[in-house]
C-alpha cells in the first residue's frame, strides 16, 4: 500500500495544543480618491478580491488555527510579513506567506504512516469518448469553489499503528488552518499583480487594466475586459468566465479553463486549454499544448490558430455557415469517423491540408499546424486508446 503523505516523526512539544485561535494578520483601509494603481506582490498567499462600495481599499486578513500549539502558531506567524505603502498615486501591498495557498489546510502527523483504505475509494471508469459541453457548463464549473470538509478529507485515509494495523484517524489529531484574506477595491483602480505559490479569486468584474505575472499560482476570475491587459502565467492554473481583449501567455499551466473569449491573443506552451465559446477576433499561437474548443458564437468572424506539436480538439460551430481550412504538414486529421495522416515535408514547407465548407462564409476557422493532431466532430470526439 502506498503512503499518501510523508511520514513525520512526532517531536516533544513543550507547549500545549490550542483548540482554536483566530489571529489578525493585517487589517487596514485606504481612501482611493487620489489612487490610480494597486500593486500586489504576493508569495504563499490565499486571497479573495472583491468590489469596494465606499471608494476605499480594504485589507482584512485573519488566520484561524485549530489543534496547533502556541509554539507552532508563533512559528507560522513570524514568517508572514504583510506591509503596505502609498507612493504617489500607487498603493503597494506586499505579503510573504508560509505557502498558505488554500482556504483550508489539513495537517496530520504520524509515527508509522498513513495509507489509502481501498474499500472507500471509488474510481471512475476510463473513457475515450469526450462530449461537447456548453458555455453554461463552464460558467457553472468556474463558479464552483467548494473544498473538501474534514470528514471528506479523512474518509479514504487510515493511520497505521505500531502493530501495522490500520485505524480511523481521530479528527482531534488533525491540525486545521483556515485562511480568511479579503481585499476590497474600487472599480477605477488599475492592478499590477505579481504572485508566486499563491491562490487568488477575483469575485468582481474587472474593466480597468490588469497586468499579471504569476508563477505556480491558481487564478480565478469572473470577467476581464480591457485591451491593455497583459498576463504572463507559468505553472499553476487559470479560470475565467469571460475574457474580452488583452494578451495572455500561458506556459506549462496545468489547466486553462475559460467559458468565453473574444478580441484577444493567446500565446501558450505545454498547456491544457479548455474553451466554452470562441467569439470574434481570437488568435492563438501555440507550441506542444492540448486544446478543447467546444462552441463558437454566431458571428465569430475569423478564428486563427498557428501551432506546432499541438493537439487540437474542436467541435464544429452549430447553427451557422462556416469554413475550415488547415494548412501545414506532418499532421494527423480525424474528421468524424475518417482519418488522414498528412506526411511531413522534406523541405519543411507547408501547404493546404484540408477544407470544410465554402470559402465565402463570413465565419472562418484557419489552423496552421505542423507536427500536430487535429480532431473535428459534431457531438463527441473519440480519442485513441
For each feature predicted by the language model, list its residue ranges.
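Intrinsically disordered, low-complexity terminal regions
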Residues: 2-8, 19-233, 237-251, 255-385
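N-terminal signal peptide c-region/cleavage motif recognized by signal peptidases
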Residues: 13-17
